[in-house]
Amino acid sequence: MSVDWRTEIYSGDISLVEKLIKNKGNCINISVEETTTPLIDAIRTGNAKIVELFIKHGAQVNHVNTKIPNPLLTAIKIGSHDIVKLLLINGVDTSILPVPCINKEMIKTILDSGVKVNTKNAKSKTFLHYAIKNNDLEVIKMLFEYGADVNIKDDNGCYPIHIATRSNSYEIIKLLLEKGAYANVKDNYGNSPLHNAAKYGDYACIKLVLDHTNNISNKCNNGVTPLHNAILYNRSAVELLINNRSINDTDVDGYTPLHYALQPPCSIDIIDILLYNNADISIKDNNGRNPIDTAFKYINRDSVIKELLANAVLINEVGKLKDTTILEHKEIKDNTVFSNFVYECNEEIKKMKKTKCVGDYSMFDVYMIRYKHKYDGNKDSIKDYLRCLDDNSTRMLKTIDINEFPIYSMYLVRCLYEYGNILKEMGSCIHNRYKK
């Protein structure tokens, strides 16, 4: 095909194009420098009549040459609905569909022309996958009207819900779940929607997914749980994802969530939350390091190490410290600040045991009973205790407020908040006293 022919195609003169086809019809499927064909040039003009003319005279709508643009994709890119319909009617190869970044009107044209809404491309992606990636709620709603399947996975094992949770789009996640999206599915890397939400989502999105999943402690292929992800990427969601059955789960390197929290950037608030919820400071990673070893290696901040030591002393007093040699750590014994702090912890616990707060119950019992309720399943004792606590809550709070127990005051206050929630379920008024 000569350059003159291309020039005349782009002129838009139908009669001139007809004359050229009549005189040079045997060249209608010949490419120019293997980069284009008469049909591709005709499509690029945006003139459906010229395109129809070429097809009528034998132009191949599925011209096979990887260097030449795909006719259907070319028509979609220039946004010509008429040419797209014309190509589809004439049997153009639709295996490229769907493609990213198609607007709502073009998708409607394609679907109305007979392409199935759940058509998969070479990567097994559907129109729904791309609409979610584009964060286009209106297109998503339209696709459901055409019967889009919410649970088709692509070659990476990603379901639509995986893409939505990576995009942190609450309304889209909500719609997918309402349409029956599976909340516990995993992609090829073992990531669940909750893994993605914990990594990329805000509190509302994580809570939404959490309300629809029955496995908060799912591990991906490298052993990471949603809680691990939250500690690394999304610390505001840590408390939401804490599950006492999985708080000590390890990844393939033997790291627990507490190990993660102790690596830079280190947040003492996150460490405090994990420890209060029974993160085990005795667990060693694959290199033989427990959390205190990790703290000395990566952080070496007195406040962090003291937080770990306070927990170790308290859990040891409860009788649940699995490795008591932690308190004999060389870095602790050789450091006057830390060894003195361990002594102060023990002294404060003695004082807690002597200080009565409700009948014969001591301040130490405030934590001890909570521990038994939380981890030993002793629910009867806590109910009796809380009924007594309800009448003595003001005095008890005052005792804690005056900071009589500087090391363990936050443990005690948190216990009271937790008790308040339990009492709320029992119909008590204590919840109102502690909710602030």
Swiss-Prot record:
Entry superkingdom: Viruses
Pfam families for the chain: Ank_2
InterPro entries hit by this protein: Ankyrin_rpt (IPR002110), Ankyrin_rpt-contain_sf (IPR036770)
The keyword NADP is assigned to this record: no
Entry keywords, A to Z: ANK repeat, Repeat
PROSITE patterns: ANK_REP_REGION, ANK_REPEAT
SUPFAM superfamilies (alphabetical): Ankyrin repeat
ANK repeats: 1-30, 34-63, 67-96, 98-119, 123-152, 156-185, 189-218, 222-252, 253-283, 287-317
Name the record gives this protein: Putative ankyrin repeat protein FPV245
Species, as recorded: Fowlpox virus (strain NVSL)
